[in-house]
A protein has these predicted regions:
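N-terminal export signals
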Residues: 5-22
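Early extracytoplasmic/lumenal segment of secretory-pathway proteins
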Residues: 22-88
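A structural signal for short loop-to-beta-strand junctions that line the ligand-binding cleft
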Residues: 74-79, 97-129, 133, 145, ...
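Periplasmic solute-binding protein
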Residues: 87-95, 114-142, 170-174, 255-261
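Short helix-loop capping/hinge motifs at secondary-structure junctions, enriched
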Residues: 135-142, 174-182, 266-272
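Ligand-binding pocket segment of bilobal, Venus flytrap-like solute-binding proteins
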Residues: 161, 165-168, 172, 177-246
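Mature extracytoplasmic/periplasmic domains
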Residues: 258-318
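Extracellular/periplasmic bilobal clamshell ligand-binding domains
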Residues: 305-340
Length: 340
C-alpha cells in the first residue's frame, strides 16, 4: 500500500480524471541494458501507473550520440545503462539534467547518487576474487593489490585488459594508487596469468574450477547467474566457488552499477520521474535482485539468498567522473604492462 501512495504522490496530476487517457501517457527509455528482468520492471510500472513504456535498445555510447544528435526533438526521457563512467559520459555530453527526489534520496545511499542529482544507481555488481572452496582461499589474498604478488604466478584467470569491467577496475585502482603503481600492478597480473585472457567472466570461473589457476576475477552477477542456471552442472559448480571481497580494510570492493538519468530534453518529465522513483521501490529492486542476480541499490531491499550468503561487504563509492577520466590512461597502462 505504501508503495502505491509514494508512486501516486511522485506523479502528481498524472492520475487526475481529466487526463486519464492511458494511451497518451508514455515514457521513452533509451536503454543499454538488455535483460528479461528489465521487461518485468517495465510491465510492473505500467500496471501500477498506466504509463506505457517505449524502449530503444543499443550500446551506451550509441545511445548517448543518438540523443545528442536528436537534440531538442529527442523522444528520449530516460537514459539507462551499466557502468558509472557511461553515466558520467552522458552527463559530460550535456544530455542529462539534475532532478531532486526526496523518495530516491531516502532509498538510495548517498554514495550511489551523483552529487549534482544527474543520476543514481539502481543495482550493483561487485568485482571480486573467486576460488575453489575445496582448495581453500589462497593465502594472503586480501586486496586487489595482492594479485600482482609473484606468489600467485600461474594462478590468475581474468578477462582481457580491454574488457569494460577491467578498465573500470583499473581506473579505480589508478585513482587510488597512481600511474606508476597501476602499471606495476598490471605487469604483475600479466606475469601471474594461468592462461592468456579468453572469454567472459563465467569462462574465468569455469577455467579456475577446472584446475587452470586458483584465482578467478569476476563480477558476482555472473556467479549468481550460474547458481540459477538451467544446467545442473553450472548450479553445482557455483556452490563450490568461494568469494573474497577485496580491500575491506581500506577503500572497499569495486562495484559496477546500473543507473538511470533524466534526459535534459525529456518531453515527458513527470512520467519519467515517476519511473525513476519506481526503480527504487521494493517491487522493482526485488526484480533486479531475484530476476537478474544483482545486488539491489536501495537500502533494506531484498537480496537473493545466494548473494546474501556471500556475506556483507564494504563497497567503494562509484565516482563516474574519475572512472571516465582515468579510463584511457588505465587501458594504456594495462596494455603497456603486457596485460592483453
Amino acid at each position: 500500500m505504501q508503495r502505491r501512495i509514494l508512486l501516486a504522490g511522485s506523479a502528481a496530476g498524472l492520475f487526475a480524471p481529466a487526463v486519464l487517457r492511458a494511451q497518451e501517457r508514455t515514457v521513452s527509455i533509451y536503454s543499454a541494458r538488455h535483460y528479461d528482468s528489465d521487461k518485468q520492471i517495465h510491465e510492473a510500472f505500467t500496471q501500477a501507473s498506466g504509463i506505457r513504456i517505449r524502449i530503444i535498445e543499443a550500446g551506451a555510447d550509441q545511445l548517448i550520440e543518438r540523443i545528442r544528435a536528436e537534440g531538442a526533438n529527442s523522444p528520449a526521457d530516460i537514459f539507462l545503462t551499466v557502468d558509472a563512467s557511461r553515466l558520467a559520459r552522458a552527463m559530460e555530453a550535456g544530455i542529462t539534467q539534475p532532478y531532486a527526489s526526496a523518495v530516491i534520496d531516502s532509498r538510495i545511499p548517498e554514495g550511489l547518487r551523483e552529487p549534482g542529482g544527474h543520476w543514481f544507481a539502481a543495482s550493483r555488481r561487485a568485482r571480486v576474487l573467486m576460488y575453489d572452496k575445496a582448495k581453500g582461499a589462497p593465502a594472503g589474498l586480501v586486496r586487489y593489490e595482492d594479485l600482482a604478488n609473484d606468489r600467485y604466478k600461474g594462478q590468475i584467470t581474468v578477462r582481457s585488459s580491454g574488457n569494460g569491467y577491467n578498465v573500470a577496475l583499473a581506473s579505480s585502482f589508478l585513482a587510488a594508487n597512481g600511474a606508476e603503481a597501476t602499471e606495476a600492478w598490471a605487469r604483475g597480473i600479466a606475469a601471474n596469468l594461468a592462461r592468456p585472457p579468453a572469454g567472459g567472466d563465467r569462462d574465468q570461473i569455469r577455467a579456475m574450477m577446472a584446475g587452470q589457476g586458483a584465482i578467478a576475477v569476476s563480477n558476482t552477477y555472473y556467479l549468481g547467474l550460474m547458481s540459477i542456471s538451467q544446467q545442473i552442472e553450472e548450479r553445482e559448480l557455483a556452490q563450490r566457488v568461494g568469494v573474497i571481497f577485496p580491500n575491506q580494510g581500506d577503500r572497499g570492493t569495486h562495484v559496477n552499477i546500473s543507473g538511470a538519468a533524466l534526459v535534459k530534453t525529456s518531453p515527458h518529465p513527470a512520467e519519467a520521474r515517476a519511473f525513476l522513483e519506481f526503480l527504487t521501490t521494493p517491487a522493482a529492486q526485488r526484480i533486479f535482485a531475484l530476476g537478474n542476480m544483482e545486488f539491489p541499490a536501495a537500502t533494506e531491499a531484498e537480496t537473493h539468498p545466494f548473494l546474501l550468503a556471500l556475506g556483507d561487504f564494504r563497497q567503494e563509492s562509484p565516482d563516474g567522473q574519475k572512472l571516465l577520466a582515468n579510463a584511457p590512461e588505465a587501458l594504456r597502462l594495462m596494455q603497456r604492462a603486457g596485460w592483453r
